[in-house]
Amino acid sequence: MLLSVYGGRSGGVGSILFQTGLRLCAALLVCTLKLAMAASAVSPDVLAKYEPVIGLEVHVQLLTTTKIFCGCANKFGSEPNTNICPVCIGLPGALPVLNAKAVEFATLASLALNCEVRERSIFARKNYFYPDLPKGYQISQFDKPIAENGWIEVPTAAGGTKRIGITRLHMEEDAGKSIHDGFSDSATRTYLDLNRCGTPLTEIVSEPDIRTPDEAFEYLTRLKEILLYTSVSDCNMEEGSLRCDANVSVRLKGAPKLGTKAEVKNVNSFRFVREALEYEIERQIDILEGGGRVVQETRLWNASEGRTFSMRSKEQAHDYRYFPEPDLPPLILSPEFIAQKRAELPELPEARRKRMIEEYELSVKDAHTLTSSRENADRFEAAAKTAKNPRRVANILISELGGRLNALGLELEQSPISMAGVVLAADLLEDGKISSKQMKGLFDICFEKKEDFPAVYEREKPEQITDTSAIEKLIDEVIAANPKQVEQYRAGKKTLAGFFVGQVMRASKGQANPALLNELVTKKLES
């Protein structure tokens, strides 16, 4: 059952005309804004005068079975307002009890992000009013969070790395969800689903070390990878288990003082974070260049219009009237507990990349692709240990198999071709028993008939011609049939070698060994 909040006016013809007028005004306003945006684009020379300063606040839902302060299910997609209890919705006399698994996950995340974990942290009440926060306050942490002083390394455009600091990681509970559309009376009512109230969160606050939208994108990408490797969250942005707010200001390059910041909310993808920051940086520079003053405020990102718009003035910490949560004691973590969690950390993405580059002789690009998911990295390594050439396995996974899966919107675990099939294909290529073209044809059959590669290979049994005399015979026939091209080649048009290779490959029905064929064609044409 959804709870509704009435927010409309009486009906009737006057009301309809009023609302129609509002819609027309809104449409005109959008058109005017778009024209203004197009007219006030900031030139590259002006952009180069300023330095953006960006900090990100990332809220991450933890994958606990139950909520942070009660025993209600922590489950996305349940019927509205079914996973709630007196603690979730703040009924008088209901007391919170801290979820130990949430503490473990927050500690793991902190250590994976190179943070210093506090042995003593304190929960606090963050007081504010919003319809989907029925208690009127949120249990969070303020001046004594569970962890501080972390960092993540991100790649730079110049090919190096940059360290982005993490100010703090703290624990808190999530609020409910306001639903503003999708109902027949959405024009006059907002519906509330309180299932999300009490969902365990960590908020990860970066230092203002980020200088470009691209750096912000890389920071979020690396952060998500690390959290997924530790299995503390599924980081599903569509379901709201990873949400990002961006704080951004601009200042003249070399200026010691920070500019006035704006907070950008409602950004539900890493791509939109980058686009929102690009827009907001230009908006603030445009204001300053026009002699105006940037206002400290919270702004919402509108992806369809490609712009931010003002939501409210930006709150300061004192606006929330933080005070220690009286119903929860301080959180005490022993050195032994912290050491135990550190020992439980898996090999993290960056360390794994470096090892795999060295161990399997992979390119940096391939190593990044294969380690972007812990599960896919595990699958690759298991296959690489049994294959004759691990690099062939990597090439097949990334190019041949990955390309097909991406086109179909499938994950690796949904592929009709198993990892054993990938290893067989790699070994057949390595031994020269099939060509790349033959493998592609077999893969096409696998996807068309939803069969694994070993079964398709056994049935089709393609053979590669590796007999030198057989290939030379085909080359002689092609040369005899194309005297004009032979003359052009010998006159200096060496690119025609590809023509002869193609003709022989066609004559062999794709079965000639490519490396041997190229060698013999060149030898014959040069003789």
Per-region residue spans from a language model:
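N-terminal mitochondrial targeting presequence
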Residues: 1-5, 16-39
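Basic, nucleic-acid-interacting segments
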Residues: 33, 37-347, 358, 364, ...
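Core structural elements
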Residues: 240-252, 358-379, 391-407, 448, ...
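Extended, non-catalytic structural segments that build the interaction scaffolds
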Residues: 337-344, 351, 381-388, 422-434
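Residue-level detector of well-ordered alpha-helical segments, enriched
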Residues: 366, 379, 389-397, 421, ...
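M16/insulysin-pitrilysin zinc metalloprotease superfamily fold
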Residues: 386-387, 393, 401-416, 424-429, ...
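Strongly charged, low-complexity linkers/loops
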Residues: 412-423, 427, 433-507
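Short, amphipathic C-terminal "tail helix"
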Residues: 495-527
